[in-house]
Amino acid sequence: MSGDEMIFDPTMSKKKKKKKKPFMLDEEGDAQTEETQPSETKEVEPEPTEDKDVEADEEDSRKKDASDDLDDLNFFNQKKKKKKSKKIFDIDEAEEGIKDLKIESDVQEPAEPEEDLDIMLGNKKKKKKVVKFPDEDEVLEKDEALEDEDSKKDDGISFSNQTGPAWAGSERDYTYEELLNRVFNIMREKNPDMVAGEKRKFVMKPPQVVRVGTKKTSFVNFTDICKLLHRQPKHLLAFLLAELGTSGSIDGNNQLVIKGRFQQKQIENVLRRYIKEYVTCHTCRSPDTILQKDTRLYFLQCETCHSRCSVASIKTGFQAVTGRRAQLRAKAN
């Protein structure tokens, strides 16, 4: 009975509980002396019934101790894992940062030949270069240009004085620009209306055309138009007959009678050509002109710009010979 009492003693159960602490041997040195005793008690266990009860108690205690030990181990392991994970995370971040830098550098190097990036980066670099280096050249060029402009302005002011033309008092030849400026200045002095940029419009009465019978037309206001143009009726009559290719004469009412059927538009076109060639000035387009005849030539002299130019003589068109006597004379000749 002494053996039975030793088996069911609560102290023995406690010692068997300490059996389950193999994981804490390193931390607690006292547990090693206690583990030696349960080994001796195993040799004393004689009966199987008692072993079953002891095993059931041991299983319960094992489950509890294992759960406690696992909790302790999980707690320590969690702390240790967190510390290690922090260190690993830092290393990974550093490695990833290095990789990112390498990747960015690798991406930037092949991206340089692209047109868009080259344009953007190249423009910025070129702007910096243009700002740095060409500034001095540009400043020098601007200074030279300003000096040239100032000299030109000074020359223009000096030449525009009352001393005369630019080439006066010097042996140099005059230039085309100087002569052109002189011509325009004289024209502005003589004709101040041109300075304002207003062009004179030559206003003329429209011709009045009336049919006479079936084969003739009458130009009613022929003499009035000759007075407006300041031209002789004979000259205008010769031009009209040559352009129209007909024959005509002035009757007692100072009306021009022309053979053929003509409309008002046709006579207007002929009058416009006559005014353009024999009335308006060829240089200033002024209608204040005089038609003069000198040695079989007609000269048109302008009263505004005092220019004088020759004018072509009026030539009659081809006329067919219809009379019998004229035909015989032509054959004889």
Swiss-Prot record:
Summary of subunit composition and partner proteins: Eukaryotic translation initiation factor 2 eIF2 is a heterotrimeric complex composed of an alpha (EIF2S1), a beta (EIF2S2) and a gamma (EIF2S3) chain. eIF2 is member of the 43S pre-initiation complex (43S PIC). eIF2 forms a complex with at least CELF1/CUGBP1, CALR, CALR3, EIF2S1, EIF2S2, HSP90B1 and HSPA5. Interacts with BZW2/5MP1. Interacts with EIF5.
Location (main, coarse): cytoplasm
Gene3D superfamilies, A to Z: 3.30.30.170
The keyword Nucleotidyltransferase is annotated on this UniProt entry: no
Protein name: Eukaryotic translation initiation factor 2 subunit 2
N-acetylserine carried by residues: 2
Basic residues bias spans: 13-22
Gene Ontology annotations for the cellular component aspect, listed alphabetically: cytosol; eukaryotic translation initiation factor 2 complex
SUPFAM superfamilies: Translation initiation factor 2 beta, aIF2beta, N-terminal domain (SSF100966), Zinc-binding domain of translation initiation factor 2 beta (SSF75689)
Gene: EIF2S2
Originating organism: Bos taurus
